[in-house]
């Protein structure tokens, strides 16, 4: 599908058509809303091929895959989440809404079914025990349903995601305490690529969960490598581990804003963390890839000769650099110096938080032994 944008009284109208090359899509919240409206229209009017829904600041025209009656008072509709130019695991996923008319005038109840996750930990926008359908999608569903709901009726709306349990392990839900499915998300109705605010917001929620569970000493990792090795080496709870992806600066800034975090241990593979020593707080390779330059500079600071520096500079991977450092018996000295600089820069930039930096190899070897001794987590 693609998105056609036109002006509507200063806002936007977005029409959705098939074309996976588009940069933006629509959120699971918008898909669930469209399916709910279509199911209601099946009951009170006629089955639509498309529906128009109102999202915050936008109007969306969404194609309906199928509608059917379950009984005289209940209908269901299926909407497929459009493809767009992003590695979103929910692209192409079907969302089903089952709408049942009730005699409880004007009262709309929203619940979940198979494939919609349940919240098990505090700190999220939804209370523990509830289905993980976020406030904005709930509001969107209610407001759009009210446009078509007969005056004397209420409605029970059940959202189902057939592939939700299968997709859930590919999302961050388990880290946030959402089990048995995925979440219905969205704040604007439009899904942006993962480099956008929508993605960084999803990372930030981890901080809220950690604080809600009483953790003030947190371990920030770039991704799966850091998480895996931290769990192998340290005694800590899942909620103490915060994934920051490439957005180091954003996540540290958000942590600093809370005013509640005592310490942050930056823990991860050398290829990511060393960039921070050069003041690079977005570690995405296409944004800044100065690994060779950083490693060459720090090797020079500890006295590496010209040939060694030349060899380091011509390496392709950080792991290759480490082999050269090992051959020259300067690995620990180089990485301890880099870790010191990381701590110095972060401490200056985010005052009031105690920082530590632990740099590791792919195989889990600790490259900064003195730093890991000082972190506020027990070692295994």
Swiss-Prot record:
Pfam entry (one): CbiD
Keywords: Cobalamin biosynthesis, Methyltransferase, S-adenosyl-L-methionine, Transferase
Key word DNA damage present: no
Reactions accelerated catalytically: Co-precorrin-5B + S-adenosyl-L-methionine = Co-precorrin-6A + S-adenosyl-L-homocysteine
GO biological process terms on file: anaerobic cobalamin biosynthetic process; methylation
GO molecular function: cobalt-precorrin-5B C1-methyltransferase activity
PANTHER family attached to this UniProt entry: COBALT-PRECORRIN-5B C(1)-METHYLTRANSFERASE
Annotated family: Belongs to the CbiD family.
Name of the protein in question: Cobalt-precorrin-5B C(1)-methyltransferase
């Amino acid at each position: 599908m693609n998105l056609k944008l036109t002006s509507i009284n200063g806002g936007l109208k977005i029409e959705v058509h098939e074309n996976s090359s588009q940069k933006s899509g629509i959120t699971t919240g918008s898909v669930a809303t469209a399916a709910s409206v279509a199911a209601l229209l099946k009951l009170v009017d006629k089955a639509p091929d498309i529906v128009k829904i109102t999202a915050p600041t936008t109007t969306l025209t969404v194609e309906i895959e199928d509608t059917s009656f379950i009984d005289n008072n209940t209908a269901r509709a299926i909407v497929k989440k459009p493809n767009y130019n992003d590695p979103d695991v929910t692209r192409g996923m079907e969302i089903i809404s089952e709408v049942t008319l009730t005699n409880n005038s004007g009262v709309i109840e929203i619940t979940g079914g198979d494939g919609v996750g349940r919240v098990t930990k505090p700190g999220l926008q939804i209370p523990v025990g509830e289905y993980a359908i976020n406030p904005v999608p709930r509001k969107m569903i209610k407001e759009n349903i009210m446009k078509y709901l007969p005056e004397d009726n209420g409605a029970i709306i059940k959202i189902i995601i057939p592939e939700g349990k299968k997709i859930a392990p590919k999302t961050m839900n388990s880290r946030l305490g959402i089990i048995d499915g995925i979440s219905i998300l969205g704040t604007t109705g439009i899904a942006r690529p993962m480099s956008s605010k929508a993605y960084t917001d999803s990372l930030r929620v981890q901080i809220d969960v950690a604080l809600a569970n009483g953790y003030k000493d947190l371990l920030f990792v770039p991704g799966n490598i850091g998480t895996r090795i931290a769990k192998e080496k340290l005694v800590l709870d899942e909620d103490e581990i915060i994934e920051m992806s490439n957005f180091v600066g954003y996540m540290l800034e958000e942590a600093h804003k809370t005013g509640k975090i005592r310490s942050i241990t930056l823990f991860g593979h050398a290829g990511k963390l060393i960039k921070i020593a050069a003041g690079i707080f977005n570690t995405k390779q296409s944004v800044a890839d100065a690994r060779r330059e950083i490693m060459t500079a720090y090797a020079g600071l500890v006295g590496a000769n010209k040939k060694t520096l030349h060899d380091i500079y011509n390496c392709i991977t950080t792991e290759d650099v480490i082999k050269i450092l090992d051959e020259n018996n300067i690995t620990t000295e180089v990485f301890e110096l880099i870790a010191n600089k990381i701590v110095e820069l972060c401490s200056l930039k985010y005052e009031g938080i105690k920082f530590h930096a632990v740099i590791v190899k792919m195989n889990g070897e600790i490259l900064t032994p003195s730093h890991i001794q000082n972190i506020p987590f027990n070692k295994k």
